[in-house]
């Protein structure tokens, strides 16, 4: 339903549809993968009852910053996306949106996001500057390092410490266990994503963990996912989370095991579906956290 409504813009206002595609609003998977961990942290920080204003701020912030991240990513990759099958029709490549328009749109999205952060507190505002730096630098990392997925993981996890400081005014050391857990998980699922482009990336000289890991890619992904669950288990113990949370982790572990089995032949589309499937793992963990606080 959501995607059908958005696609109707293509007929009503093709220009607006170009910007929908630029921000990937027609592909909300990135919103989910960024949203669930942010909500994990917000619910834990609020001990099951985070403030409504913070929920609104962080949900809107996730949507806006993810959109901005897509814009700056496409701007950075505008000269190479035409050589990759999956990205050759993006608006900046086709010329439907100019480089200048993309940069202005990125600035607008980040400006609105910053206005939302101003509704929190000084510590959260300062932390947001680090998140902006990570989001803006990530698209350029693939040119210089085989670890762009690590930078993405750092950026995708940055909302978690911000959620703690916004909700409590404090940042306990254990919150960084959640941060590390999400970073490891992100590197894992984004490696599946990078595996879909690996052949094209090798031709044009773009680097990724999928290339770095080589034949060990799936084993390393599963290891990263397992370490992520260990970090979450340790953090859960410190935050006194119990059975429902553990059930959420068990469901996530089942998701990871299925992805490992499903991608056994490393088919490009299967790797992409495994990437998409991680949304369910994040949701399962969030439901476990919510239920654990709700049924006490």
From Swiss-Prot:
Signal peptide: none
Catalytic activity as recorded in UniProt: all-trans-octaprenyl diphosphate + 4-hydroxybenzoate = 4-hydroxy-3-(all-trans-octaprenyl)benzoate + diphosphate
Pfam families recorded: UbiA
Major subcellular location class: membrane
Cell location: Cell inner membrane
Record bears the keyword DNA repair: no
EC number: 2.5.1.39
InterPro entries, per database record: HB_polyprenyltransferase-like, Prenyltransferase, UbiA_prenyltransferase, UbiA_sf
Keywords from the named record: Cell inner membrane, Cell membrane, Magnesium, Membrane, Transferase, Transmembrane, Transmembrane helix, Ubiquinone biosynthesis
Entry-linked CDD domains: PT_UbiA_COQ2
Gene Ontology CC: plasma membrane
Pathway named in the protein's UniProt entry: Cofactor biosynthesis; ubiquinone biosynthesis
Known role: Catalyzes the prenylation of para-hydroxybenzoate (PHB) with an all-trans polyprenyl group. Mediates the second step in the final reaction sequence of ubiquinone-8 (UQ-8) biosynthesis, which is the condensation of the polyisoprenoid side chain with PHB, generating the first membrane-bound Q intermediate 3-octaprenyl-4-hydroxybenzoate.
Protein family membership: Belongs to the UbiA prenyltransferase family.
Protein name (record): 4-hydroxybenzoate octaprenyltransferase
Gene: ubiA
